[in-house]
Amino acid sequence: MTTRKIQQIIQGQPASDGAGVKLIRSLGSANHLRADPFLMLDAFSSENPDDYVAGFPSHPHRGFETVTYLLDGHMLHEDHLGNKGNLKSGGVQWMTAGRGIIHSEMPQQENGRMRGFQLWINLPAREKMKPAGYRDIQAEEIPTAPFADGSVKVIAGTYEGTKGPVQGGSTDPLYWDVQLNAGKTFEEKIPATHALYIYPFEGSVEIEDRVLKAHQGGVLGSGDTVSARAGKDGARFLVLAAKPLQEPVVQYGPFVMNTREEIEQAIRDYQNGVLAV
């Protein structure tokens, strides 16, 4: 057993996206910090409707996957394929942009708390131009596995025999929401083949003598085990792991490809109305 250590701490930065939705961006911030194959992680949380009510009007994507996990609130997804999905508290929308998708995510509430995450996962070159896809995962489809000192909500991958609704795929992702009691330790094997990113959003965790506070992401190094100890107030954190692609990444806004020429083609396709054909 080799326990992973934190290689890099990424401080989440205030940002806005869509039509002015306020959020905290760790991966994918202005300095383009990434953790292959993870391109971006945004966290949003507010009870002020001015921070979120304008939502994310219609916009394009190409070349990667987006995962929206809503802790609290209600959003409506619509796309050019005719998909329409209500994302409610505890639910997930897993969207594969592939060769192209044009979609919107709009709040369906005028007050109350809106809280959640959006994660971008890169696709390998061979899959960047595959047909777009969309999956709406309701809260009741996502299992929670209790253990002595907390619980794990399993969105993707498997935790101690509990399988999440998302399995396999080119990067074989793990996406866990871990709740850990104060002063207790979460220890679990993570495939040595996978990159690992830990993101606490409540409380703090200590990993091999380094502390991650809320909205500080930790890129962990090589090994096959993660060991995280909750601080005095307990902790809730995301465990994100996946196989690195080790391919060139060229990004321009909502397009993520392997070369500048492919980005230029994506822009032309969008301008000519054929991005998502």
Predicted regions: what they are:
Residues 1-277:
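Jelly-roll (double-stranded beta-helix
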